[in-house]
Each structure stands twice: as structure tokens, then as C-alpha cells.
């Protein structure tokens, strides 16, 4: 999986940062997929500066309905349609996302030429297929807001072809069945269990993307043991009280949560427009003082999960 930050500013865009949007390129060997998390104003403009096309999007996950997270959605949906795309698209989001989307399209005389499904989520599993499970967890913000935990299912172990050949089993169609862990009967009557020739399953990656939140127990539970956590850091530690009063977190609080949840890497975003480049360096230092495995996101930054 690879994350591409399209917008990393809080509330309003700046000259160097657009408002919130994050692409997730699944890069799964058996399943192509491009997911978008939040869609602030100007997201489709940001996409134009990448190698990705809106037509490749198949899922959009909205954390909450504040404008800096959704005002880019109607335009993106329309542009995707005007490009002639007919591939289905599913939008997941809190209560109200259906009304917001349908009202924006209706009042502007717009429509989509592709199947559009809108799913209003609550806590729990919101999507599951053979490769991934996505779970929503409620966060602490003035409006209904969610974080999303994306879990890649464990991948089967690798087949030890050399061991099979050493045991007198020739390469061929049977190898594919053995790779799936099946038990097969050879021409000489031997029974071979594929599980005996497979390495241990490869654990799937765990990625957690938060919407806006002040510290809360649910956030800690959702982030537990994630390989990568994306967390907002709207304000510096000295302004923690102000951040919390508005449903946001400070640098110190985001880093503490990452440490307490035993995550592998912390990516901080949703930076207040009050901070210039030097200020952002200070924010990162505050985070790393508590949790060293931290990076401060920039627009168009790409991170492998």
C-alpha cells in the first residue's frame, strides 16, 4: 500500500498546503484499487499534479462533514463523470453524507453517468472483501467524525518449490494446488499436503487514518498496533487547551497516542495555517521528542505502508 497526501492543511488552504485529502493506492498483487480519504476543496486540482486519474477511484471515505474535508467532493464526482468514466464508485461517510452529495448534485443540475453508491457508516466494519477489512471508529469532534482502520488480510505463505522437487515432485499444474495448501494424490499413490511445503503466512499491513479528533479512548483502541497511523496535529503543545476545546489534538497528544498504541510509524497532518516552514519543523520536533518514528506530511508526499 502507498499513501499520497493531496492536502495537509487544517481549515483553509495555504500557498504550500491544500486542505485535507489522502490517496491510498492499494498496490495489491491480485486487486487493483485506489481509495480517497476525505475530499477538501481543490482535491481534483491536486490530483492533476499526480499520476493518478479520478476514474481510477473506486472508494471514497469521508471522516466528517466539515467543509475542509468535503467541499471538493461534488466537483470531483462531476469531473469523473464528464471524463466518460463508467466504473462504479462508493462513498462512505457519516450521517448526512448522502444528503450533502445528492443536494449538491441536484441544485447544480449535475449527475453522474456511473453507478454511485453512498453508504452512511456507524462504528464497526464498513467494508470487507477477500483482501481488506475497513473498520470505522467514532472520534472526539464537535460533529460526527470517524477514523478508519484498513487491515490487509494475511497473505498465504510461499511454496517451497525446491523442497517439492527434492522429494521427487515435478513442477506442473499440481504446484498451483499445493500453493493453495490443498492435499493432492500423486500418480505413484503418494498423498502430499501442500501445507507442509508452505512458509508461514505473511501478516497483512494495518493502516489507520484519523479524521479530526481530540484525545479519546476510542482513538487509542482504533490505532492499536497499526503499522502506520495518520493523525492530525492542528496546534503545538503550548496551545493544547485551545486545540482540545475545538475537537483537535496537539503535537504532544498525537505522539503520545502513537506511543501508547504501539504503532510502527506516525504521520502527522492537518496543520494550522498559522505555521510556516520553520513552525512546521518545530511541530515535528515536538512530536519526535515523544515518538521518534514520526514524519510531518507535506502535499504530494508519498509513503509506503
Curated annotation (Swiss-Prot):
EC class (word): hydrolase
CDD domains according to UniProt: RNaseZ_ZiPD-like_MBL-fold
Record keywords: Endonuclease, Exonuclease, Hydrolase, Metal-binding, Nuclease, tRNA processing, Zinc
Signal sequence extent: none
Enzyme Commission code(s) on record: 3.1.-.-
Residues annotated to bind Zn(2+) 2: 68-69, 212, 270
Disulphide connectivity of cysteines: none
Record keyword Cell inner membrane present: no
Cofactor(s) of this protein: Zn(2+)
Tree of life domain: Bacteria
GO MF entries: 3'-tRNA processing endoribonuclease activity; exonuclease activity; zinc ion binding
Keyword presence, Nuclease: yes
Classification via SUPFAM superfamilies: Metallo-hydrolase/oxidoreductase
Active-site annotation: 68
InterPro entries membership: Metallo-B-lactamas (IPR001279), RibonucZ/Hydroxyglut_hydro (IPR036866), RNase_Z/BN (IPR013471)
Details of cofactor binding: Binds 2 Zn(2+) ions.
Role according to the record: Zinc phosphodiesterase, which has both exoribonuclease and endoribonuclease activities.
Family: Belongs to the RNase Z family. RNase BN subfamily.
Known partners and oligomeric status: Homodimer.
Protein name according to UniProt: Ribonuclease BN
Gene name as annotated: rbn
Amino acid at each position: 500500500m502507498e499513501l499520497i497526501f493531496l492536502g495537509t492543511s487544517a481549515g483553509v488552504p495555504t500557498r504550500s498546503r491544500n486542505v485535507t485529502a489522502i490517496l491510498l493506492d492499494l498496490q495489491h498483487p491480485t486487486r487493483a484499487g485506489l481509495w480517497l480519504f476525505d475530499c477538501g476543496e481543490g482535491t481534483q486540482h491536486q490530483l492533476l499534479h499526480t499520476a493518478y486519474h479520478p476514474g481510477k477511484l473506486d472508494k471514497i471515505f469521508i471522516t466528517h462533514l466539515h467543509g475542509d474535508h468535503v467541499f471538493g467532493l461534488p466537483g470531483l464526482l462531476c469531473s469523473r463523470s464528464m471524463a466518460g468514466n463508467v466504473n462504479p464508485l462508493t462513498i462512505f461517510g457519516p450521517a448526512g453524507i448522502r444528503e450533502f452529495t445528492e443536494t449538491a448534485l441536484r441544485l447544480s443540475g449535475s449527475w453522474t453517468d456511473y453507478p454511485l453508491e453512498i453508504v452512511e457508516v456507524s462504528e464497526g466494519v464498513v467494508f470487507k472483501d477477500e483482501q481488506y477489512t475497513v473498520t470505522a471508529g467514532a472520534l472526539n469532534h464537535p460533529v460526527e467524525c470517524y477514523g478508519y482502520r484498513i487491515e490487509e488480510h494475511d497473505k498465504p505463505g510461499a511454496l517451497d518449490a525446491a523442497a517439492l522437487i527434492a522429494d521427487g515432485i515435478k513442477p506442473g499444474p499440481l504446484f498451483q494446488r499445493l500453493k493453495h495448501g490443498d492435499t493432492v494424490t500423486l500418480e505413484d499413490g503418494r498423498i502430499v499436503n501442500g501445507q507442509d511445503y508452505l512458509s508461514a503466512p505473511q501478516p497483512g499491513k494495518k493502516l489507520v487514518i484519523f479524521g479530526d479528533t481530540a484525545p479519546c479512548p476510542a482513538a487509542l483502541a482504533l490505532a492499536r498496533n497499526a503499522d502506520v497511523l495518520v493523525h492530525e496535529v492542528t496546534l503545538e503543545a503550548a496551545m493544547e487547551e485551545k486545540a482540545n476545546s475545538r475537537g483537535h489534538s496537539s503535537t504532544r497528544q498525537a505522539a503520545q497516542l502513537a506511543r501508547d498504541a504501539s504503532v510502527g510509524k506516525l504521520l502527522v497532518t492537518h496543520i494550522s495555517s498559522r505555521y510556516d516552514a520553520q513552525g512546521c519543523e518545530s511541530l515535528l520536533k515536538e512530536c519526535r521528542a515523544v515518538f521518534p518514528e514520526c514524519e510531518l506530511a507535506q502535499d504530494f508526499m508519498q509513503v509506503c505502508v
